[in-house]
Every structure is written in structure tokens, then in C-alpha cells.
Amino acid sequence: MNFHEYQSKQLLAEYGIPVPAGKVAATPDEAVAAANSLGQGPWMVKAQIHAGGRGKAGGVKFCKTTDDVKAAAAKMLGTKMATYQTAGVELPVNLVLVTTAGEIVKELYLSVLVDRGTKTITYIASSEGGVEIEQVAAETPELIHSLNVDFVEGVQGYHGRDFGFKLGLTAKQAGQFASIMVNLYRLFNEKDLALVEINPLAILDDGNLYALDGKFDSDDNAAFRQKALVAMRDKTQEDPTEVIASELDINYVTMDGNIGCMVNGAGLAMATMDVIKLNGGEPANFLDVGGGANKQRVIEAFKLILSSDKVEGIFVNIFGGIVRCDMIAEGIIAAVKEVGVKVPVVVRLEGTNVEEGKQLLRDSGMAIIPADNINDGAKKIVEAVKNAA
């Protein structure tokens, strides 16, 4: 789950990490009231969407007067915004964050994440903040510093001071940096986060460090014990189909292709998409119906797939270990009848009760195309979509 900037800053402040004073607003008048409550300007007005790159998209404005604040908020609120991080998708701007604006002396970068390669919580820091860290890594990798955290020792003050001196900070600033790192470690672990990125972590004209922007990503598997974080979820920022899928506890991700996929198991689902591409097709989605799939779940999966008008064919690829192939077949038949599927459907079944499942499909009288294996199924659905065009 992702968070808005204002939510991230609330969490940072809760853990003693300094952030500029700010208030969120839903109308231009609320934005003016927020600015007045923060004291004398200047202020920053920032569109709240689940994406970075807002500045280049017109979503971050420097304002010297409250009239400027009102105009900036009016221009952002109620619109939709796309950035280089949204892959062309426009996200609604329902809120703006109004903050105090200080003069930036230096921008740094700091993040903490789970490094699957080293199997540790890892800090990444750079003296080049305010830009994409991938760009820094490609152009000036020597400016990036990392720390793999020992789970027994955790993060200590000397780790932060060492980082701070590598980034060219003064002794006072290195001490502040150390405090931020230690507090960030507590936040990361106590809130079950998968990523915290502060970019920029800035030195302002008062000589102190402040988190000017924050990007958080939580571990969805820990949602059951993070009710306060779940309450922060903004479904308006998410793909509507993915929201419905999450409520049905179906793993679904929208993609750009035209071949819908219904598969059980994440690994098999990824392999299915790969084989479709190898055969010249483009998957329209990732959909893992799960090992505990039943007839109703299959029907709901079909509805999810066909909610996209881009889908021109469906490949069902099931390996019946826990799930029974005959039950999947019953679900497919019911789904085709209930949803009114008008695109080609290719089905590959293997595993428990596979012959019973295949017989049900044959006896259904429906134009369901059988496949012997994953490659055969991918070839058949790609060909069927081409022929139906």
C-alpha cells in the first residue's frame, strides 16, 4: 500500500524526524486558511497523488502570498495529474498539502528498504538528493553509500554519523542525520514497512535537516496488525479493478496487453505471462486466483478480467494441486454463462481430477478451446485472438 506525502510526513513526525510544518486542504479556501495558520509566507502548495515527479507536472508551486496559495490550489484541486511515474495514468488530485517554505542549502537522499539480495534491511544515502536515485547510480555511483543492518545490533548512532561525514555534513548535522537514521529504523520495523524514501532530505537556511518529501510503501502481508495504516488507504489513487480484486482477496495487477490470464499460483501466473509474450502475445493482467479457488471465485475472476475492454481473449492455466480441476471447470462454465463471454477462451488443466474437468468442458457445448500444456495454450490463445480480430 502506498501513502500520500502528507501521511508519510505525519508518520515521520510521529517518530521524531523533522518535517516542515504543513496542513492538508480540500478546497482553495481551506488552503488559504492553512497558509495563514502556518504563519508568514512563503509557502509550498503540493498536489497529493500517489506518485513522484509532481513538480514537473505542475503539482508543486512556490507561493509568496495567500492569493498565490489560493490560485495554486484552485489550479490543482479537482484535476487529474500524470507524471513519469504513473505510466500515462492520470490520478485525481483531491487534496493539496500547504507547507512552510525555507531556502534549501543542500539536498540529500536517504532511504531504507528490504534488500532481497543480502536479506537485510538496507540504508541507501547520497549527497545528491532531489533527483531520481537511479539517475545518480547510473551517472555518479561513487556518490551512493549503503549500509546492510545487522539484525542483532540494529542501527546505532555511529552508523549515522559515519554516513553523515561521508555526505559532507558538519558534526552537528551528522548528529542530526544519525538521529534520523535511528528513528527511521524504529518506524520501518514498528509499522511493517517495505520502503521509506526521503527525497530530498534537505539542509535549510537554518542549518538543520528536514524531510521535505517522503515516499512510503507498506508490507500488505502485515495489514492485519497495522489497522491505522490501512485506514490511510486512498482507493481513489488505485486502479478500480485492482481495488475490487483486493476486496475479493484475489491477486490482480492490470497490464497493457489484450490477453486476459486466470492462473492459480503466483509463479505459474508469471510463467504464463512470459510464455504468452514468447508466442507474440501481450498479457492484459496478472491474476492469481489462489490455491483455495472455488466456483464463485472463478466467476469473480472472469468478471475482473472482462471488466477491461482491452481484453480480446482469455487463457485459463490451472495446475490442480489443492484446487480440483473439475471444480475449476464448473466455475469456467458458470462464468461463461453468467458473464456472457464473447472472446476466445483457452483452457489448460492439469492435476487433481483433470480428466473429470476436461470432460465437463467437452460436455458443456461451449466454444472453449482445450490446451495440452502451457506452451500449447499460449500459442492457441494468441492465434485465436489474431483470427478473431
UniProtKB/Swiss-Prot annotation:
Q: Which GO terms describe its cellular component?
A: succinate-CoA ligase complex
Task: Locate the residues binding ATP.
Answer: 46, 53-55, 102, 107
Gene3D superfamilies in alphabetical order: ATP-grasp fold, A domain, ATP-grasp fold, B domain, Succinyl-CoA synthetase domains
Q: Which UniProt keywords apply?
A: ATP-binding, Ligase, Magnesium, Metal-binding, Nucleotide-binding, Tricarboxylic acid cycle
Cofactor(s) required for function per UniProt: Mg(2+)
Q: What is its EC number?
A: 6.2.1.5
Name by which UniProt lists this protein: Succinate--CoA ligase [ADP-forming] subunit beta
Q: What class of enzyme is it?
A: ligase
This protein's species is Stenotrophomonas maltophilia (strain K279a)
Associated pathway: Carbohydrate metabolism; tricarboxylic acid cycle; succinate from succinyl-CoA (ligase route): step 1/1
Q: What family does the database annotate?
A: Belongs to the succinate/malate CoA ligase beta subunit family.
Domain (ATP-grasp): give its ranges. 9-244
Gene Ontology biological process terms in this record: succinyl-CoA metabolic process; tricarboxylic acid cycle
InterPro entries tied to this protein: ATP-grasp, ATP-grasp_succ-CoA_synth-type, ATP_grasp_subdomain_1, Succ-CoA_synthase_bsu_CS, SUCC_ACL_C, Succ_CoA_ligase-like_bsu, Succinyl-CoA_synth-like
Entry's cofactor comment = Binds 1 Mg(2+) ion per subunit.
Q: A single Gene Ontology molecular function, please? A: magnesium ion binding
Catalysed reactions, semicolon-separated:
succinate + ATP + CoA = succinyl-CoA + ADP + phosphate; GTP + succinate + CoA = succinyl-CoA + GDP + phosphate
Purpose of the protein: Succinyl-CoA synthetase functions in the citric acid cycle (TCA), coupling the hydrolysis of succinyl-CoA to the synthesis of either ATP or GTP and thus represents the only step of substrate-level phosphorylation in the TCA. The beta subunit provides nucleotide specificity of the enzyme and binds the substrate succinate, while the binding sites for coenzyme A and phosphate are found in the alpha subunit.
